[in-house]
């Protein structure tokens, strides 16, 4: 990802470049020592501890882009920035699968869709997108990203809802999607106080998704963070619900590579089923 670098990591911290600004953020997975001297870490424009400490007048938001899609980055609560750079390979996968699909118009469902970067990649590739998140501020941010790209007229449906309830209703309506993307958290709340617990609800959600996948499906992609399961568990669960379509299952870790020492930082896991039609 050209607008991002993992400059260094160590001792529970990450030093990262988001566009023109350097951020120092916590990461409990980083158990090793830093490579760069402390003086290099002091160049950070903002540091997150319990809250963001804005040292060098980082603006309220600033622009980044990847492969023609622009998005706003912000110093958001809980150390977040509105973008997960390790997912850039997934965005390119989404773009390739849709743009090379034989389907006349691909109908995509994006669940736990956050600030909408994957939705914009899907839309730009020619898909009709249903973008769902339980957080209204996240939907607002996604709309800002849409407008930044001049895509106000793109066929994207924006929905604030609980993922399990929505897919329940879609199954009863007979709705069908050619591809499904999801980034389920370990815990979360729906807009009406619904409780999301990955260990209890993930299989139910995948079952719902298996009922609304079309008869010419392209892919189902799951990214997950901070869960106790492995990517193999995700893959096995996908196989159970989508293996009847044939195709193939892939899985692995979401990683970032340091500039300082070349170490790989694992940030999450992923698994995906694909029909295999698009190579």
PLM regions with names:
Residues 135-181:
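S-adenosyl-L-methionine
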Residues 85-103:
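Conserved alpha-helix/loop element of class I SAM-dependent methyltransferases that forms part
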Residues 217-279:
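C-terminal catalytic and target-recognition region of SAM-dependent MTase-like enzymes
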Residues 128-134:
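Conserved SAM-binding motif I beta-strand of class I
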Residues 163-244:
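S-adenosylmethionine
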Residues 115-127:
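Conserved SAM-binding loop of SAM-dependent methyltransferases across substrates and taxa
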Residues 2-19, 23-85, 92:
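Non-catalytic substrate-recognition/targeting regions of SAM-dependent transferases
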């Amino acid at each position: 990802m050209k607008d991002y670098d993992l400059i260094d990591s160590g001792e529970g911290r990450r030093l990262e470049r988001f566009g023109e600004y350097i951020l120092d953020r916590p990461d409990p997975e980083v158990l090793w020592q830093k490579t760069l001297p402390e003086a290099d870490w002091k160049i950070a424009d903002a540091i997150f501890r319990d809250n963001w400490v804005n040292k060098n007048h980082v603006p309220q938001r600033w622009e980044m882009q990847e492969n023609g899609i622009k998005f706003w980055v912000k110093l958001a609560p809980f150390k977040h920035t509105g973008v997960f750079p390790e997912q850039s390979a997934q965005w390119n996968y989404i773009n390739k699968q849709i743009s090379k699909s034989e389907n006349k118009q691909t109908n995509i469902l994006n669940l736990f869709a956050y600030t909408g970067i994957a939705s914009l990649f899907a839309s730009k590739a020619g898909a009709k997108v249903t973008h769902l998140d339980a957080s209204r501020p996240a939907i607002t941010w996604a709309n800002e990203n849409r407008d930044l790209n001049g895509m106000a007229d793109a066929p994207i449906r924006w929905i604030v809802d609980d993922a399990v309830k929505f897919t329940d209703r879609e199954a009863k309506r007979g709705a069908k999607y050619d591809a499904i993307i999801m980034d389920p958290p370990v815990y979360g709340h729906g807009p009406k106080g619904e409780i999301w617990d990955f260990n209890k609800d993930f299989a139910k959600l995948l079952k719902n998704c298996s009922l609304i996948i079309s008869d010419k499906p392209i892919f189902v992609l799951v990214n997950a963070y901070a869960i106790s399961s492995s990517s193999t568990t995700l893959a096995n669960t996908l196989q159970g619900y989508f293996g009847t379509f044939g195709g193939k299952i892939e899985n692995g870790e979401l990683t970032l590579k340091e500039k300082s020492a070349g170490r790989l930082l694992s940030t999450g896991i992923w698994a995906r089923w694909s029909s295999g039609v698009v190579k």
